[in-house]
């Protein structure tokens, strides 16, 4: 009996000693939260709305809807890429990039004023609108465990615009005008990442910016959501969503340029981490 009780007590003590190790092993460890380097490349499938205004030096200008007025497509599949580097246990540095170039041709039913160019009713207007966004961020995870992290970051969305309008009227060329604007928009970011299992994880991020200074004003809101599946040690897959809304206005050489744009759609990518 004593031997039986001794064996039972030894078993209980052994199980109690093994319990913390078992619980520790049960905590999921996903590569997205563990690996120091993370790279991804894939496709972004956004729907977009675009409006812009470029005043002449005399102050004449009108807001133009590039999709409805100038015949640009509302959606286009574009490549995207992102990278992350973890420095220590709590710091992380990220970059994400996409570029969307579009063009359109349409006979307009109203007068279009774009900078110093005027396109009268029934003229054929050819438009080109190129946009790129480079997101840079340095984040600090104030809450960090093996399977969870929540943090804040500072960074910038470097938004670059290149818009050109040209046209003809009754077969005769009217002229063209191009406006280029590149603006690094500083943002405050909030992010989180959670491992569901050793292979599945979810992540979320929100960027926010608002500034009015001298002859510049702008605001930006960006949201990113991701579901990540990594069946291999160094290779995985991701499905997510991106939403970006921005508005900026700047005055230069007596002319005011204003851009307002939204992007929203799914992303699909392959990632490598180590």
Where are these regions (language model features)?
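Cleavable N-terminal export/targeting peptides
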Residues: 1-34
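Short glycine/proline- and aromatic-enriched beta-strand/turn motifs that initiate or cap beta-hairpins
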Residues: 23-100, 267-273
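Residues on the lipid-exposed face of transmembrane beta-strands in outer-membrane beta-barrel proteins
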Residues: 41-43, 81-85, 95, 136-140, ...
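Extracellular/periplasm-exposed beta-strand and loop segments of Gram-negative cell-envelope proteins
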Residues: 49-77, 99-132, 159-183, 211-215, ...
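Repeated loop/turn-to-beta-strand initiation elements of outer-membrane beta-barrel proteins
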Residues: 90-93, 146-148, 198-202, 234-237
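Early exported N-terminus immediately downstream of N-terminal targeting peptides
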Residues: 97, 148-159
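Outer-membrane beta-barrel transmembrane domain signature
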Residues: 157-233, 244-247, 274
């Amino acid at each position: 009996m004593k031997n039986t009780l001794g064996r039972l007590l030894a078993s209980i003590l052994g199980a109690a000693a093994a319990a913390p190790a078992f619980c520790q092993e049960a905590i999921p460890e996903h590569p997205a939260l563990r690996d120091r380097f993370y790279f991804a490349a894939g496709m972004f499938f956004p729907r977009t709305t675009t409006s812009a205004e470029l005043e002449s030096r005399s102050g004449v200008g009108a807001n133009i809807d590039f999709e409805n007025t100038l015949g640009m497509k509302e959606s286009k599949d574009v490549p995207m890429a992102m990278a992350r580097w973890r420095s220590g246990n709590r710091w992380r540095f990220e970059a994400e990039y996409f570029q969307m170039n579009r063009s359109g041709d349409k006979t307009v039913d109203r007068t279009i004023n774009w900078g110093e160019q005027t396109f009268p009713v029934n003229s054929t207007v050819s438009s080109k609108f190129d946009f790129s966004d480079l997101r840079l961020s340095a984040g600090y995870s104030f809450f960090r465990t093996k399977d969870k992290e929540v943090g804040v970051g500072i960074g910038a969305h470097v938004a670059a615009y290149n818009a050109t309008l040209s046209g003809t009227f009754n077969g005769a060329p009217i002229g063209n005008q191009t406006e280029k604007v590149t603006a690094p928009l500083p943002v405050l970011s909030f992010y989180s990442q959670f491992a569901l299992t050793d292979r599945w994880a979810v992540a979320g991020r929100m960027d926010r910016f608002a500034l009015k200074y001298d002859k510049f004003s702008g605001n930006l809101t960006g949201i990113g959501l991701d579901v990540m599946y990594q069946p291999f040690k160094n290779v995985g897959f991701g499905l997510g969503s991106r939403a970006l809304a921005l508005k900026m206005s700047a005055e230069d050489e007596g002319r005011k340029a204003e851009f307002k744009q939204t992007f929203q759609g799914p992303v699909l990518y392959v990632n490598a981490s180590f």
